[in-house]
């Protein structure tokens, strides 16, 4: 029996920052399947287009009624009657035929909006799992051609100190994460992370006052820290005090495009101070040296977006210098785009992909980006966005793709913990068929 799509309805809901986003209900004979898409704060210029209304009289221009209209009036009529198990066919129809917009890096989704296409793509995945009588993670594994007998549970990279565009402090680097690689299971890794998080909260309260323990968009703290060393010292102290020295490592997301000056090709580490004295302006080469020094001094295992999204040269220099011991992750550099990944492979620019489904705009293309990266022995980290919803799709996706690592915020705020809690459920349901990535989070666990 064919399980066809009988109805699609899109609506505008609020994300975790109070901004509108797209949610879709997709109906088949087996029920109603729902999906909601996230949105980012520090977005790469090469990401697929997130369609906003730009009507300043409504939600300050951030409404998504255009995307909703595109779903209900353009996409839905074409998908009614299609088999919900034909994921690739449906995604290709939306991306290539109904939208059809392109730029130098591929399909740009600038006509219908990546937020419109992705919401349906995710809902179709959920609907497609139902007739197969399998969980979403097992169905996604099938779509990716991955084995689904033994599944890999990821190491959580928990964002506990915020800077950059995510925070009102002076800190230029955007995220400082704790990575519990020494835990025996996901459940224990989450416990290690939560305990370090609460220990860190006490340390921050003691040193910076109670106001400094307010949390940011992703649940992390944003005390008035001035530089990376200060943040890293805090983390090392918290890890040690919690009793997890050696078992919990550190990852950073620098988001360097946010403080890059393209005119003189420099990086301003004091970019949040207006009219500063330029004493913290660095060249790409100086920034390479800074990262090398930090890696020598602290237990850092991963650095994301260490340079601007077009600074291929310094990416390659850093990867050559420390890539054997440290994961160099491309986010704004790659934007989950297979064409950008191919260029990075040619230039040896980095050795890991940050996988964000809404950067590329369809599940088929996201899987393609992951498989291309894994084929070339890169690490892959599945990621949330700073504007999230209660949708837990990425928790199933990370298990399905066997990437061994996920970042979806601090162990705080329900839209973040929703993903971690779903991973707890998946690990429990798999029983002995669950393998925790642990120290091997960068390796191919295929």
Swiss-Prot record:
The record's gene field reads: ENO
What InterPro entries would the database entry show?
Enolase, Enolase-like_C_sf, Enolase-like_N, Enolase_C, Enolase_CS, Enolase_N
Query: Which residues does the Swiss-Prot or TrEMBL record annotate as the active site?
Result: 218, 356
Q: Which residues carry this modification: Phosphoserine?
A: 42
Name the domain of life this protein comes from: Eukaryota
Self-association or partners: how does it assemble?
Homodimer. Forms a complex at least composed of DegP, ENO and HSP70. Interacts with G-actin. Interacts (via the DKSLVK motif) with mammalian host PLG/plasminogen (present in the mosquito blood meal); the interaction occurs at the ookinete cell surface and is required for ookinete invasion of the mosquito midgut. Interacts with A.gambiae EBP; depending on the Plasmodium species, the interaction is either involved in ookinete invasion of the mosquito midgut (P.berghei) or is dispensable (P.falciparum).
Q: What is this protein called?
A: Enolase
Say which enzyme class the record assigns.
Answer: lyase
Its Enzyme Commission number(s) read: 4.2.1.11
Q: Where is this motif: DKSLVK motif?
A: 277-282
A Pfam family this chain is assigned to: Enolase_N
Q: Which residues carry this modification: N6-acetyllysine?
A: 133, 375
Reactions catalysed, semicolon-separated, are: (2R)-2-phosphoglycerate = phosphoenolpyruvate + H2O
Q: Would you indicate the residue range of the signal peptide? A: none
List the keywords (alphabetical). Answer: Acetylation, Cell membrane, Cytoplasm, Cytoskeleton, Glycolysis, Isopeptide bond, Lyase, Magnesium, Membrane, Metal-binding, Nucleus, Phosphoprotein, Ubl conjugation, Vacuole
For the ligand (Mg(2+) 2), the binding residues are 253, 304, 331
Q: Where in the cell is it found?
A: Cytoplasm; Nucleus; Cytoplasm, Cytoskeleton; Cell surface
